[in-house]
Amino acid sequence: KYKVDRNDTLIAFGGGVIGDIVGFTASITLRGINFIQIPTTLLSQVDSAVGGKTGVNTKEGKNLIGTFYQPKLVISDVSLLKSLPKREILSGYAEIIKYGLIMDKRFLNWLLDNESKLMTFNKKYLIEAVFHSCKNKAIIVRKDEKEKNIRAILNLGHTFGHAIEAINNYQKSLTHGEAVSIGILMALDMSSLKGNSCLLYTSPSPRD
């Protein structure tokens, strides 16, 4: 109908679901055409728009249908976040904190020191948070793009989080970031019970 050819480019302008669907569509159209990500939520800017995971959800579960397919370009403009309710900012903040927990203690301490600035949409600090989140994720993805090994660390909180979303029938009463936040706490609790307690989590001061 639209006479698409391999020289065309799809643009994903929206949050994580839009990015996943457009990316998946690009990956299976004519065996792959270019696409560009322009994420408009904090969560998508720091996580889902980068890394190359695409897919569509089904009633059977999340991520059962999808591909690894990298965008040609990701444009993250934090000015687009101004219209978001605080709840959506907090949802994205969960993914940002994840990077601090799994690989970057200095970044985690910076987040704790500047939480109020991030929550009040300080552009300078939001840019810094988005940049370091994407940088940390890129380090992992370069080593293991298809998630056969170390990339699985980026799923901290997601195993439990996806189960929570499924139990909740993927209703908007619980955002993805909120489910991941709960999932991270559950994962850290399980780790502690198995004798692999996380110092950053169990210590009264994350800097100890």
Please place each PLM-identified region on the residue numbering:
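N-terminal small/polar loop signature for handling phosphorylated ligands or for N-terminal nucleophile
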Residues: 1-36
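A glycine/threonine-rich phosphate-anchoring loop and its flanking beta-alpha core
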Residues: 23-116
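Short alpha-helical scaffolding segments that buttress acidic/His motifs in well-ordered protein cores
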Residues: 93-97, 111, 129-137, 184
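Short glycine/serine- and small hydrophobic-enriched flexible loop segments
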Residues: 95, 166, 185-193
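Oxyanion-binding "anion nests"
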Residues: 121-168
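Small-residue-rich helix-loop
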Residues: 178-182, 186
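Conserved small/polar residues in nucleotide/adenosyl-binding loops
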Residues: 201-208
